[in-house]
From Swiss-Prot:
Keywords: 3Fe-4S, 4Fe-4S, Electron transport, Iron, Iron-sulfur, Metal-binding, Methylation, Repeat, Transport, Zinc. Binds 1 [3Fe-4S] cluster. Binds 1 [4Fe-4S] cluster. This is Zinc-containing ferredoxin. Ferredoxins are iron-sulfur proteins that transfer electrons in a wide variety of metabolic reactions. Residues 1-38 are annotated as: N-terminal extension. It comes from the Archaea. Residues 1-38 are annotated as: Disordered. GO terms for molecular function: 3 iron, 4 sulfur cluster binding; 4 iron, 4 sulfur cluster binding; metal ion binding. It comes from Metallosphaera prunae. Its cofactor is [3Fe-4S] cluster; [4Fe-4S] cluster; Zn(2+).
């Protein structure tokens, strides 16, 4: 299921393509590769 606290349990690191980007649980390798700022 979807974690109802997802939006509040993880810090917002930025905004990308109109969607909020949340700090990844794993090292941000994919995020950096995609150029998502944080």
């Amino acid at each position: 299921g979807i974690d109802p606290n997802f939006r509040t349990s993880r810090p917002v690191t930025g905004d990308h393509a109109g969607h909020k980007v949340y700090a990844p649980a794993d090292p941000p390798v994919k995020e950096k590769a995609l150029g998502i700022h944080g």
